Structures are given as C-alpha cells and as structure tokens.
C-alpha cells in the first residue's frame, strides 16, 4: 500500500470502524491540584466523564485530597506529630532496646512475627507453626537473610535502603533524613491522612499518618527488582499503652496475595539481647 494515497476520509472511515468511543480511556498525568477541577468539568455528549485515580505504581486509589498550599507542612512536622502521639521524644529515647511480637493465622498455620531492635541493629523473624521460616538482620555494616540453614548477604543497594529504618523507633532516625518528603494528603478507609515517602535505590516506603491523631495507620513498601515492583502493605490500628508508649495492637500485613491479621501479644522495653539474636 502507498501511504501517500491515504486520505483524511480513509483515516476517518477506519477510525469509525475500529475505535469505539464507549470503550475509550483518557490517561492524564501531572500535578493533580492543577488538573483535577478542569477534568471534573469535562463534558461529553451531555455527561461528565468518570474519573479514576491511581498512585505512582498504577494501583487504584480513592480520590486524594489535593491542595496547592499545605501551610508549611513538612515530613518533619508529620513525624514529630507521630512521635509526640505515641509517647514523646524524651520517653522514646529512654528505650535503648525493644522486643515486639505479633501472632496471626494464615492458610491454617499459626504465624509469629518478632522484631528485636537496638539503635544500630534490627532482627525480624517470621515463624510458621513454631518453625523459623525467615530471619532478616540489618546493621549499619551489612544486611542478610536466613531461610533454614541458608544465609544470604543482601546487595549493597538493598542494605543502603534498609539501614535508613534502623533504630528502636525508626521515625527518630527519619527526622533528619534529607530524602524523606511530604507528598500530600489522602483518604485511607475514610480517614484523612498525611503521606510522606522515602524513595530509595531499590526499596521505597510510603508512610501514612492520621491527620488528627498523628498515629501511623499504614505503610506501603515497594521493592523494585529488575523492573518488577513487589508491593507489601501493612496496616496498623487499635493502639494500646505499654509503659507510657503506644503500640498498634492490630496489624494487617500482606503476604503474597493474602492479608494476615495479626495481634500484638508481647512488648518488652529495654530487654537484654544476646549475639545469637542478631545472627
């Protein structure tokens, strides 16, 4: 076929045959606060077009609250509000070590998630029916994962991202991290939240805090490996007081396509750890 012989009428005829407006979609990217009001007023054949919203990773979300001016709100403001809500910076800094244990059920098996933290080292263990399934240890120097008898050191770019969250209460470390940014407000499960984000080389984490209580209600961790993002979500609720510090007694955590509901069963402040706890 000779493309020079194609006429405007030919293009219109083919378009009318193969392009059905009822199945059409318009994809718009950009700064939402500058676009949304204009998009809401788009009228086609006497009807306003329906609008769907997606996050940076293509996941469908509720309509975010978009404002041009957040009155000077910063990531540091949000973090400080959270730290004050759970006990206050002075109280939190008096805790040098901590052990936290959650229990839940998945696929007919009992699941235990246990965290042991020092200021410069963290151990996360997952047990299924009493058997250790996975353990990850992160320090300032390295990070590794153990599964059964196998131990694998994580690459430097993984470690660089993971060590950003070191500390008994990681938000204290994040206060002075120049890479964490306030990205706006959203609605999560009918709750208005502040969103802050830490974008890493491999692992990026989005933290969501209740605007009014200051408490953290959700974390979304996205790991990008070879162009394939893996998303893990954790929800937090029903905070309880342990010696003057609030901890979420309910935690929902994604495990593959499933979500595990977990309950807080133990919190120990300033325990003594052995070297084995971090090996």
Ranges and model annotations:
Residues 1-95:
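Mature, solvent-exposed C-terminal subdomains and processed small-chain segments of exported/organellar
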Residues 6, 11, 21-24, 34, ...:
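Extracytoplasmic
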Residues 14-17, 113-116, 246:
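Short, surface-exposed beta-strand/loop micro-motifs that present aromatic residues
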Residues 29-33, 44, 56, 105, ...:
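Solvent-exposed coil/turn segments that connect beta secondary-structure elements
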Residues 70-77, 84, 140-204, 211, ...:
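Flexible, processing/modification-adjacent segments and terminal tails
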Residues 76-150, 176-182, 187:
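N-terminal mature ectodomain segment of secretory-pathway/periplasmic proteins
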Residues 132, 191-278:
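Gly/Pro-enriched, hydrophobic low-complexity segments
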């Amino acid at each position: 076929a000779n493309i020079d012989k194609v006429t405007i009428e030919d293009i219109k005829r083919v378009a009318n045959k193969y392009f059905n407006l009822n199945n059409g979609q318009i994809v718009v990217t950009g700064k939402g606060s500058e676009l949304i009001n204009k998009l809401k007023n788009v009228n086609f054949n006497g009807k306003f077009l329906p609008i769907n919203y997606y996050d940076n990773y293509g996941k469908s979300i509720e309509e975010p609250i978009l404002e041009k001016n957040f009155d000077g709100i910063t990531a540091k403001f949000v973090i400080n509000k959270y730290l004050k809500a759970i006990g206050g910076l002075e109280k939190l800094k008096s805790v040098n070590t901590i052990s936290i244990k959650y229990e839940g059920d998945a696929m007919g098996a009992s699941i235990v998630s246990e965290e042991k933290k020092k200021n410069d080292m963290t151990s996360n263990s997952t047990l299924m029916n009493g058997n250790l399934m996975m353990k990850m240890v992160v320090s300032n120097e390295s990070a590794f994962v153990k599964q059964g008898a196998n131990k694998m050191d994580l690459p430097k770019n993984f470690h660089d991202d993971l060590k950003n969250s070191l500390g008994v209460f990681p938000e204290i470390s994040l206060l002075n991290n120049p890479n964490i940014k306030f990205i706006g407000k959203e609605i999560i499960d009918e709750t208005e939240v502040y969103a802050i984000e830490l974008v890493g080389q491999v692992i990026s984490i989005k933290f969501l805090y209740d605007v009014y209580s200051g408490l953290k209600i959700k974390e979304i961790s996205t790991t990008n490996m070879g162009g394939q993002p893996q998303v893990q979500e954790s929800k937090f609720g029903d905070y309880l007081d342990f010696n003057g510090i609030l901890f979420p007694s309910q935690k929902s955590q994604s495990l593959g396509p499933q979500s595990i509901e977990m309950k807080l069963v133990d919190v120990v402040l300033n325990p003594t750890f052995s070297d084995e706890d971090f090996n």
